[in-house]
Amino acid sequence: MRSKFDQQLAALNQELTEMGATCAQAIGLAAQALEQQDVALAAPVGQLEEQTNEQERTIEALCLKLLLQQQPVARDLRQISAALKMITDMERIGDQAADIAEIIPFFLSHNTFDCTLVCRMAQQASSMVTQSVDAFVRRDVYLARSVAGQDDLVDEDFTAVK
């Protein structure tokens, strides 16, 4: 029974890793389109956002299946609960990447816009998504804390952009 549960947890980790990669790709494309002033580069971001939505539904269903069929306790329950929180955040990140891609024509029409900070924020956010999922899958508390510390840098850049 436990081996089946472990296999399902491994599948959950794989799905989370794939969703994280999709989010990172969406952020990267939006930033690249902005940096290179090329609206066409941002076109796939909407599809990636839809993919992120689908991945959220898939992972949510997997988590609910684990909760209902396996009735996990303690550490396993916390892992599934954390996964549910992560997918909500990653889905929102996908939405925000799509929003950035959507407003790129506006940014490009204002020649005074400097994308340096936004592009740096995107690069940091993309890296943070990847590292967060990695920390979760490997159960690496130190990496998770490191990612949390990086959030302050993104916040500083965001304040400067506003």
What are these regions (language model features)?
Residues 1-162:
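Cytosolic, long alpha-helical scaffolding segments
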